[in-house]
């Protein structure tokens, strides 16, 4: 049994709480949160050991591992405390708001030999795992371009104060929504060489962003367009979709299915034939012992627990992988600011801005010689 503690009792924290309590190989030894109301509720009705202070919980509960589900700006400090005490860490996404801190913590976890994982759950969605398998099998040949999208109805009006509406807390469409398709791009293609044309816009939010658009360029690899909007009421809930074009076919994947088009039947994608093929997530997903929000949430926690039990520090969602995503988001934010602050080109001269027929009329006014000179 893995002795595990949980830090943070927001929406994701409560989701993780329900999963780990049902896990047959986990002993939940403590929960930590500043909300005394939530702690009293859980202590009285669930019989859990509750704490308002992280250091006290570590000292008394002696966890082998912790799940960090606090607002993003607290991640770095909490993760560092845990790692320095030899505790394995699962941290919610985004990992850190400063990618340099993400990289530093990744290196610390590696030096300590500790299991480290970040909650990018789309890497545990069967359809996106199938995309990974197909790309590694070179099923669609050389990938030339990707469209990575995410849409949903998170902010549909001017909102009150919460972490989602505050840039300093890690709120905003870029870090909360765009992080997911960006993380998938990192998983499939690594770290891009550069970004360009990034647009980060507000629709309803005052302090942070509601739309993110831009292009990333992978060295000796594809280009990828990112299109994300969390103020889109046409979607009932969050939707992430990737459309991948290659020299020998195409892949379109979301949480529900993986559609594959192959130009011929000679590719190495086992089980796929020429033309369109569809694999549904329900056919690709393994059964889980406990379901909440989606199988991928249980699968990622089970993966973390099994890594601890086996002593393996290799992880599909490691701190190092998440640091790439943090860095790419930082590159896009810097690019968007550079575009906004770029100087505006000087207006054309009066002569060049004058319409063609205006110049012809001027030629007629000054005489036949001027008109001939114009046409020469």
Labelled PLM ranges:
Residues 1-45, 372-373:
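N-terminal Rossmann-like dinucleotide-binding module
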Residues 16, 48-108:
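Beta-loop-alpha module in the N-terminal Rossmann-like domain of NAD(P)-dependent dehydrogenases
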Residues 30, 64-65, 145:
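Short, Asp-centered acidic motifs that coordinate Mg2+ and/or phosphate
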Residues 65-68, 289-291, 299-376:
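C-terminal helix-rich "cap/oligomerization" subdomain common to oxidoreductases
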Residues 104-122, 141-146:
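Rossmann-fold dehydrogenase core element
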Residues 122-205:
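Predominantly a Rossmann-like dinucleotide-binding segment in NAD(P)-dependent oxidoreductases
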Residues 204-207, 222-299, 315, 372-376:
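NAD(P)-dinucleotide binding in Rossmann-like oxidoreductases
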């Amino acid at each position: 049994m893995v002795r595990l503690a949980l830090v943070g009792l927001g929406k994701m924290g409560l989701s993780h709480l329900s999963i780990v309590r049902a896990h047959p190989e986990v002993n939940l030894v403590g929960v930590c949160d500043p909300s005394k109301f939530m702690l009293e509720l859980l202590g009285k009705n669930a019989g859990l050991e509750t704490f308002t202070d992280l250091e006290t919980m570590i000292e008394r509960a002696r966890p082998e591992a912790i799940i960090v589900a606090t607002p993003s700006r607290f991640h770095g400090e909490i993760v560092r405390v845990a790692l320095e005490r030899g505790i394995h860490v699962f941290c919610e996404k985004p990992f850190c708001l400063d990618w340099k801190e993400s990289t530093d913590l990744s290196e610390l976890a590696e030096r300590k030999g500790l299991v480290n994982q970040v909650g990018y759950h789309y890497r545990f969605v069967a359809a996106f795992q199938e995309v990974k398998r197909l790309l590694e099998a070179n099923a669609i040949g050389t990938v030339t371009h990707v469209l990575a999208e995410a849409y949903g109805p998170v902010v549909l009006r001017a909102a009150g104060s919460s972490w989602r509406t505050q840039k300093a807390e890690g709120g905003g469409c870029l870090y909360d929504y765009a992080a997911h398709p960006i993380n998938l791009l990192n998983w499939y293609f690594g770290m891009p060489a550069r970004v360009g044309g990034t647009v980060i816009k507000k629709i309803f939010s005052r302090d942070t962003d509601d739309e993110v658009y831009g292009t990333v360029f992978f060295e000796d690899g594809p280009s990828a367009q990112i299109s994300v909007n969390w103020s889109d009421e046409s979607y009932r809930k969050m939707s992430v979709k990737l459309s991948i074009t290659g020299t020998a076919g195409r892949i379109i994947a979301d949480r529900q299915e993986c559609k594959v088009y192959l130009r011929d039947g000679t590719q190495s994608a086992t089980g796929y034939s020429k033309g369109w093929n569809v694999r549904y997530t329900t056919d690709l997903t393994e059964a889980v012992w406990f379901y909440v929000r989606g199988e991928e949430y249980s699968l990622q926690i089970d993966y973390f627990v099994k890594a601890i039990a086996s002593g393996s520090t290799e992880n599909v969602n490691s701190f190092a992988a998440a640091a790439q995503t943090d860095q790419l988001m930082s590159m896009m934010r810097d690019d968007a600011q550079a575009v906004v602050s770029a100087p505006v080109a000087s207006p054309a001269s009066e002569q060049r801005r004058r319409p063609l027929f205006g110049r012809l009329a001027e030629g007629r006014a000054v005489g036949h010689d001027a008109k001939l000179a114009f046409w020469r």
